[in-house]
Amino acid sequence: MAILKWKLSSNQISTTETADIQTDNDNRPPQAAAKRRRPADTTDTAQPLTKLFCADPALDNRTARTATNCTNKQRTVCSSNVAPIVHLKGESNSLKCLRYRLKPYKELYSSMSSTWHWTSDNKNSKNGIVTVTFVTEQQQQMFLGTVKIPPTVQISTGFMTL
């Protein structure tokens, strides 16, 4: 393999302007480009993993549900941070419009997702899901009693581990 180098007017060789030419005399395989080195890891590994990956409970002002006060008895394992949720299922565009109509009711929910859908769904439909999370079950019930949900939207309630 031969490399052409172009000479500049000041008799300097530019290494950025190169071209690869395959010749019959050169039977060597092409060499791989040099790999970039990753920057050194700055994570302090002396700390236990729980300190690295768990949130500081002092920063989280929401009431966390613990395994002792978990109300979902059908589950065998109950996480320490469980939130009541509502899944709103329906046509994606109507769910998007519903999300905008629910903005004045921000005090009735903790957070609301964008419209999403399951990727493994083989139905090839335009149905989507919006997930609404709450701090308490009372807040969830107040949301469902106050907000008017269109009849084309299906409502599913449950719990989500956060």
From Swiss-Prot:
The Polar residues compositionally biased stretches are 15-24
Task: Enumerate the residue ranges of region (Disordered).
Answer: 15-47
> In which compartments does the protein localize?
Host nucleus
Keyword Iron listed: no
Predominant location: host cell
Name one process (GO BP) from the record.
Answer: regulation of DNA replication
Cite the InterPro entries for this sequence: E2/EBNA1_C_sf, Nucleotide-bd_a/b_plait_sf, Papillomavirus_E2_C
The answer to keyword Electron transport applying to this record is: no
Q: Name one GO cellular component term.
A: host cell nucleus
Gene3D superfamilies in alphabetical order? 3.30.70.330
Can you name one GO molecular function term for this protein?
Answer: DNA-binding transcription factor activity
Arranged from A to Z, the UniProt key words for this protein are: Host nucleus
Family from the record:
Belongs to the papillomaviridae E8^E2C protein family.
Put simply, this protein is called Protein E8^E2C
What organism is listed for this UniProt entry? Human papillomavirus 33
